Swiss-Prot record:
Gene Ontology annotations of biological process type: cellular respiration; Mo-molybdopterin cofactor biosynthetic process; nitrate assimilation
NCBIfam families, per the entry: NAPA (TIGR01706), PRK13532.1 (NF010055), TAT_signal_seq (TIGR01409)
Entry protein name: Periplasmic nitrate reductase
Homology family: Belongs to the prokaryotic molybdopterin-containing oxidoreductase family. NasA/NapA/NarB subfamily.
SUPFAM superfamilies linked to this entry: ADC-like, Formate dehydrogenase/DMSO reductase, domains 1-3
Length: 830
């Protein structure tokens, strides 16, 4: 009998053989795969797509990626890939790849309304620097900004933070992870005082029950879903509960399927907490030692413009994250309003199902892993949802041990490793440091060897606020990297696109392909992709993974890191730092930002001789030192000794990733637990050391309605999201023929009864209309997604069907993350 491992190895051999043009005869295990004969060079790399962090083996021939397959040595995916992963070799080779800078010109000069014209990198940076310098001189650092990405490599994000927060003295840098993970970050920080999951993927093989909250793992984290499926089908006692506002592929495995009314998850979470207390299932030993209670501020608004009526009416819009100390008795009394009658009516879920769900958490013999993604995080009360699910695990002590894990899954390949850990948010610095804590900028300034007071102490503009400031003409020089925000942002016609085309603004977009966002830019810079550069990502289980540059980028395309560092040469400290700082530190006068930030005897201290001679490294060859190693080792200073310890740089090129904190060469699987986490003191058992008292916080937080609900004029809920075959805005996956043919267009998934009521059938054209905009698509009443009556689901990958014309730019007031899951629309037959 062929074992699973043998099957995977033979499949890999088939891939290699077919790529090399070898015909197969007999068993695949006999195929010649020696690089001497196939001329294929195989190397490891993390997948370019989601936050699972699968490892793949990449085959290169004649400076082109020709094949990939799942890495059987990877602890994450164990040789498997999802359908996107299987076609990684094709994402870089679309026919319309951008290969040279393009500047809008009219009569040979830059003009906002000009046509895109090829220019040299020197001319591109000359014009770009002129616009940035003009803005800095006339309006100061708050008028320049950057929108980055959870797809940045670790060192790209780190270099961007240095350029903006230290170089330009502007905290107006934010990642697109604001749209996907900001509520998770705030949830961790409020409950535990430190970011990122305490568990790891090993929890899957230990859990007795899985509860999915707003997470379609079958399509968004399919490799993890295969592990959940294997656990469920191999162990009959294991149960799977799936909660969602519509039915999707995860329901195929669900023992307990629950479809609930949008926003009612808040009430369901409080009902479960009440059930645990009423049934006397509280783990008192754990709670008494490791937990304290707080009441969070309520009536906090919806993150809309301050003049919006909902913001004016909110009692605590100015202090949404406020909280005061409380007690268990007060918490118990608070929960009394969430009885079965109230919650069942509000949510649409029966008492029987609610009790079955609550029993999974309450039963002390059941190890529970909770998974959630955008259903929780893209929510006007997303931080509360995160806090409330932690409540359940803390009340029962089901946390930080194998199989007991509240697990926030990440959507992007380095939303954790770059956006969160590096601190590319407008309020953060590396290793959970923030600009508002005077000690943290001081630490950063010493580490970066720059004068005191350079880093501003006020948070910059978050993602949605950046769009508003662009529209209002208060943010004027703007750089976008590794995202497609005009297509991705909410309420794009009213709040996003106008700012990009504001005649007072200069917009730069670094991109690999033409996108909706690049078409709205003034300057397009061609970007290197994935293995065209040396990189590092950090996945959802705190695993940091490296890869080498395997091929060269086409034409004049350059990595985002090269662009950031090279652009920094165009500025001197005299142009960006005030005289009051330079007069106290005259040794910095006249120096370029490149010299100050990157040639600082820290970043540039590693020789290019340390680079593996078997691989190229374009940035290091250009700048004359091992850029990636220098940036990483300087960045790692922030986390070492602060609970975010990273291993030495070279070790990551040898390993299939390591889960931080890495102390004395050993990775950490379960944080906060004695014997697993080196930061937990002996005898403590558990220690939530993000808070000074070592305790986690249980929050009393109420149900509050969404910012917009269906009414007589707009009677349907609109939910947006993704599909298995496409990544985010589709700019890569729609250029892979197999993925495009599988799902060429977005569709409006709706209930057959709603279709009959509207007089439409499957395949008919329909308009989706909100108070903000409209788009045309076609009806789908069958297939993978099955909404309940009164709700439609529309994916956002399709640039020809911009569903974000319709969405509302409401955000969680604490995290500033957008709610893409709830707004009201009407449907019109075309």
């Amino acid at each position: 009998m062929t074992t699973r491992r043998e099957f995977i190895k033979r499949s890999a051999a088939v891939t290699a053989a077919c790529t090399a043009g070898i015909s197969l005869s007999g068993e695949a295990s006999n195929v010649i795969t020696d690089s001497e004969y196939t001329r294929l060079k195989w190397s490891k790399a993390p997948c370019r797509f989601c936050g699972t962090g699968c490892s793949v083996n990449v085959a290169v021939k004649d400076n082109q990626v020709v094949a990939t397959h799942g890495d059987i040595q990877s602890e994450v995916n164990r040789g498997l890939n999802c359908v996107k992963g299987y076609f990684l070799s094709k994402i870089m080779y679309g026919k319309d790849r951008l290969t040279q800078p393009l500047l809008r010109k009219k009569n040979g000069e830059y003009h906002k309304d000009g046509d895109f014209t090829p220019v040299t990198w020197d001319e591109a940076f000359d014009v770009m620097a002129k616009q940035f310098k003009k803005t800095l001189k006339e309006k100061g650092p708050t008028a320049v900004g950057m929108f980055g990405s959870g797809q940045w490599t670790v060192w790209e994000g780190y270099a961007a933070v240095k350029l903006y927060k230290a170089g330009f003295r502007s905290n107006n840098i934010d990642p697109n992870a604001r749209h996907c993970m900001a509520s998770a970050v705030a949830g961790f920080m409020r409950t535990f005082g430190i970011d990122e999951p305490m568990g790891c993927y090993d929890d899957i093989e230990h859990a007795d029950a899985f509860v999915l909250w707003g997470s379609n793992m079958a399509e968004m984290h399919p490799i993890l879903w295969t592990r959940v499926t294997d656990r469920r089908l191999s162990h009959p006692h294991v149960k799977v509960a799936v909660l969602s506002t519509f039915q999707h592929r995860c329901f195929d495995l669900a023992d307990l399927p629950i479809i609930f009314t949008p926003q009612a998850d808040l009430a369901i979470l409080n009902y479960i907490a009440r059930y645990i207390i009423e049934k006397d299932m509280v783990n008192w030993d754990f709670v008494n030692k490791h937990v304290r209670f707080k009441v969070g501020a309520a009536d906090i608004g919806y993150g809309l413009r301050p003049e919006h009526q909902l913001e004016l009416a909110a009692a605590n819009a100015s202090n949404p994250g406020g909280a005061k100390d409380s007690s268990f008795e007060e918490y118990k009394n608070f929960l009394q309003q969430y009885d079965a009658q109230f919650v069942s009516k509000l949510s649409g879920a029966s008492k029987e199902k609610l009790d079955q769900l609550a029993e999974l958490y309450a039963n002390p013999k059941t190890r529970v892993t909770s998974f959630w993604t955008m259903g929780f995080n893209q929510h006007t009360r997303g931080v509360w949802c995160n806090n409330l699910v932690y409540n359940l695990h803390l009340l029962t002590g089901k946390i930080s041990s194998p199989g007991n894990s509240p697990f926030s899954l990440t959507g992007q390949p380095s939303a954790c490793g770059t956006a969160r850990e590096v601190g590319t948010f407008a309020h953060r610095l590396p290793a959970d440091m923030v600009v508002t804590n005077p000690k943290h900028p001081e630490f950063a300034e010493k580490t970066w060897k720059i004068p005191p007071g350079v880093i501003p102490d006020k948070p910059g503009y978050h993602a949605v606020l950046q769009n508003r400031k662009l529209r209002d003409g208060e943010l004027n020089a703007y750089w976008v990297q590794v995202n497609n925000n005009v297509q991705a942002a909410p309420n794009m016609l009213e709040e996003t696109l106008p700012g990009y085309r504001n005649p007072n603004n200069f917009i730069v977009v670094s991109e690999a392909y033409p996108t909706v966002t690049s078409q709205a830019a003034d300057l397009i810079l061609p970007a290197a992709m994935w293995v065209e550069k040396e990189g590092a990502y950090g996945n959802a289980e705190r695993r940091t993974q490296f890869w080498r540059q395997l091929v060269s980028a086409p034409g004049e395309a350059k990595s985002d890191l090269w662009q950031i560092m090279e652009f920094s040469k165009r500025f001197t400290t005299d142009e960006v730092w005030p005289e009051e700082i330079l007069s106290k530190s005259p040794e910095f006068k006249g120096k370029s930002l490149f010299d100050v930030l990157f040639a600082n005897n820290s970043v540039n201290k590693y020789s290019i001789e340390e680079i593996d001679p078997n691989y190229k490294n374009h940035e290091s060859e250009h700048f004359g030192f091992y850029v990636q190693k220098g940036l990483f080792e300087e960045y790692a200073i922030f986390g070492r000794g602060h609970g975010h310890d990273l291993a030495e740089f070279d070790r990551y090129h040898e390993a299939r990733g390591l889960r931080w904190p890495v102390v004395d060469g050993k990775e950490t699987l379960w944080r906060f637990r004695e014997g697993s986490d080196p930061y937990v003191k002996k005898g403590a058992g558990y220690q939530f050391y993000g808070h000074s008292d070592g305790k986690a916080i249980i929050f009393a937080l109420p149900y509050e309605p969404p910012a917009e609900s269906p009414d007589q004029d707009y009677p349907y809920w609109l939910v947006t999201g993704r599909v298995l075959e496409h990544w985010h805005s589709g700019s890569m996956t729609q250029r892979v023929p197999e993925l495009y043919l599988a799902v060429p267009d977005a569709l409006v998934y709706m209930h057959p009864d709603d279709a009959r009521k509207l007089g439409v059938r499957r395949g008919d054209e329909i308009k989706v209309v909100s108070r903000r905009g409209e788009m045309r698509s076609r009806v789908e009443t069958r297939g993978r997604n099955k909404p309940p009556v009164g709700l439609v689901f529309v994916p956002w990958f399709d640039a020809s069907q911009l569903i974000n014309k319709c969405t509302l730019d409401a955000t969680d007031p604490i995290s500033k993350q957008t709610d893409f899951k709830k707004c009201a629309v009407k449907l019109i037959k075309v």
